[in-house]
Amino acid sequence: MKRLACLVCSGTAALTAHAEFDANRLWVNAGFYSAHFDTDQGLRNANPGIGFEYRIDDTWSATAGRFRNSNNANSNYVGAYYQPWTWAGVKLGVVAGAFNGYPNAYEGGWFPALIPTASLEGQHWGLNMALVPPLKDRLYGAVSFQLKYRFR
């Protein structure tokens, strides 16, 4: 955990050194709503939380946050969106990062993830959509939706 925190701080410092912070690029993200593929598992669909997403350019953004996951445990995440394609105004790509807090996945510890994503962004409101693949008996798959807001 300490190593991950150091990595995030180092990345943030490098970003700050590269470009000046622009508040217009910062999104505040709510938790998630997850439509699970396995509806009979008693999973929590509403996953409240808070996160932040900083749009570095039209293709890249950095993200981190905390939410109550589908197993009713607290989870943290950190990652980077790479969305090089746009179709009908929707950004398409992946988010690569790490999650923790899932009791059946790596004993609740941190694990890597690569998740297909689509994002729709307006002037103030946006929506991230993710296709979370199932991971055997460790993580249940879902289509997840994350509402976001930008103060401009």
Indicate where each model-derived feature is located.
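Residues on the lipid-exposed face of transmembrane beta-strands in outer-membrane beta-barrel proteins
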Residues: A30, I50-Y54, A64, V78-Q83, ...
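Outer-membrane beta-barrel "beta-signal"
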Residues: W27, F32-A35, Y140-R152
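Solvent-exposed loop/turn segments connecting transmembrane beta-strands
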Residues: F37-N45, F67-N76, T86, N100-F111, ...
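Outer-membrane beta-barrel proteins
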Residues: L15, A19-E20, I56-D58, Y81-W87, ...
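Cleavable N-terminal export/targeting peptides
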Residues: M1-A23
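Short glycine/proline- and aromatic-enriched beta-strand/turn motifs that initiate or cap beta-hairpins
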Residues: H18-R66, N76
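Repeated loop/turn-to-beta-strand initiation elements of outer-membrane beta-barrel proteins
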Residues: L26, D58-A62, A88-V90, L120-M129
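Transmembrane beta-barrel strands of outer-membrane/channel proteins
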Residues: A30-S34, A64-R66, V94-A98, M129-P133
